[in-house]
Amino acid sequence: MFKSMPLMKAAKPFANFLKDPLKKYRAFKGVALPNRTWPSKSITKAPRWLSTDLRDGNQSLPDPMSIPEKKEYFHKLLELGFKEIEVSFPSASQTDFDFTRYAVENAPSDVSIQVLTQSREHLVRRTVESVKGAKKAIIHIYLATSDVFRDVVFNMTKEDAIAKAIETTKLVRSLTKDHPEMQETEWNLEFSPFLIIDTPTDFAV
């Protein structure tokens, strides 16, 4: 079903692989905030692993994956042992919404289904609807925080961005963890400042 790409032959296979890849990069410098617990912490062990292969960029492909192809990919990720899988941007299309429903109905009880949405109320509501009934779900919201996107594209001040982040977080909680009809699901929230690499550190934290 999938077209395999020819692999490039290395002159000396594995010769340049690092024995300990963790030592390749300098550790991220923590941010000293006395009233916060996590910004100053350092990563000292392997983090949680999440597959995000099934969402976002796929929408821009000239020949995007069909639902049967997405299903095959999803089950391959389960075979590989992923416990957190970001499956879609369910508010982007009916295809993504329908595939999300398939993932929810076929995921093992120890696998979290993650979905992505912008910080806009109607999109958040549609996104939460897509994972209703999941055993474990992660709602991943993102918001423009870099100066270019926040100021030029969306015409928002830093105060506007913070207010929107709080508003959206409260909305997600009201639709999930605090909603009486959503208690069968173990809910988690992920928030991403966009683009984090171009966002001033003090503002992002």
Language-model regions, residue ranges each:
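Glycine-rich, proline-tolerant flexible connector loops at the mouths of alpha/beta enzymes
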Residues: 82-111, 115-116, 143-156, 192-196
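Alpha-helix N-cap and loop-to-helix initiation/capping positions
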Residues: 65, 69, 95, 156-164
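Structural preference for beta-strand elements that scaffold enzyme active sites
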Residues: 48-49, 59, 84-86, 110-116, ...
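Glycine-rich, aromatic-flanked loop segments that form ligand/cofactor-binding clefts
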Residues: 27-47, 114-141
